[in-house]
Amino acid sequence: MDEEKRPKPLPPSLRGRRRYIAYQVISEDKFIFQDLINSIWHSLLNLLGELGASQADIWIVKDTYDEKKQIGIIRCSHNNVEQVRTALALIERIGDVRVVVKVLGISGSIKATQMKFFEETKLTEFTKTL
């Protein structure tokens, strides 16, 4: 595409405000990530309906899901954070596995969410400087 025909990106003042929700899945057994996505969408659609789910602007960030710790991030609109938290709390099963989805916290950027809720404290950060 030519540079002249490309649409201009929206300025930050016109973009939607987003929040990133860190969640942890506590389960009795292992499950497939795609089943988790299906359960989240099923819960959102049951609680909010199609119109509410589209207004919530949900995006499940696949690259940030840690299968070992079962921690992930969901992006949503700043107006719908509480509805998304409620939908996550209503998830009881992923496939045939009984689960509890715990919200770890909310942040305004993916980087801050990862630093707060994913990173383990490293002992090298506490070295004494003289």
Task: Set out the residue ranges of the language-model regions.
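Helix N-cap motif at beta-to-alpha junctions
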Residues: R75-E82
